[in-house]
Amino acid sequence: MVVRKGKKSRKLQGRTRTMGWGRVGQHRKSGSRGGFGAVGFHKHKYIWIIKHAPNWYGKHGFRPRSRIHENVTINVGELDELAWRLASNGKAIIEDGLIVLNTVEMGFDKVLGSGKVTRGLKVIAREITEEAKRKIEEAGGKVILLEELEAGSAT
């Protein structure tokens, strides 16, 4: 094959009407690419969607703030410190030798198991991890879940 000395675009410049694209109108507007923009994504360009943008359709994005609820948590170590502070101020509620901490009234949803428990606590909680429950009971404390309280008061 003969090597082309100049570019095709330079050769065609200024002297041809169709610039090597056949009949007038071929390659002129958006018909050659199947329409402008996102046209045909559910029709003739669907294979492109499957290959390059599989998440194009469907719901994505933000959830309403009113629907999102993040658990507010507290560790047993922090509860122990809080109990010590309340006891030293004389504001602690004591039942059967245990300092009562109602985490639901404090605004916490869940009690986690990080930290040490050094005194007997009676913890009322909405949710609690196994580790936290074990640590509180090993220190001579007691755990009461809110469900148990509500079930007990209903009967």
From Swiss-Prot:
Pfam families: Ribosomal_L27A (PF00828). Keywords: Ribonucleoprotein, Ribosomal protein, RNA-binding, rRNA-binding. GO terms for cellular component: cytosolic large ribosomal subunit. The keyword Protein biosynthesis does not apply. One of its GO terms (biological process) is translation. It comes from the Archaea. GO terms for molecular function: rRNA binding; structural constituent of ribosome. The keyword Transit peptide does not apply. Part of the 50S ribosomal subunit. PANTHER family: 60S RIBOSOMAL PROTEIN L27A, LARGE RIBOSOMAL SUBUNIT PROTEIN UL15. Binds to the 23S rRNA. Belongs to the universal ribosomal protein uL15 family. This is Large ribosomal subunit protein uL15. It comes from Desulfurococcus amylolyticus (strain DSM 18924 / JCM 16383 / VKM B-2413 / 1221n).
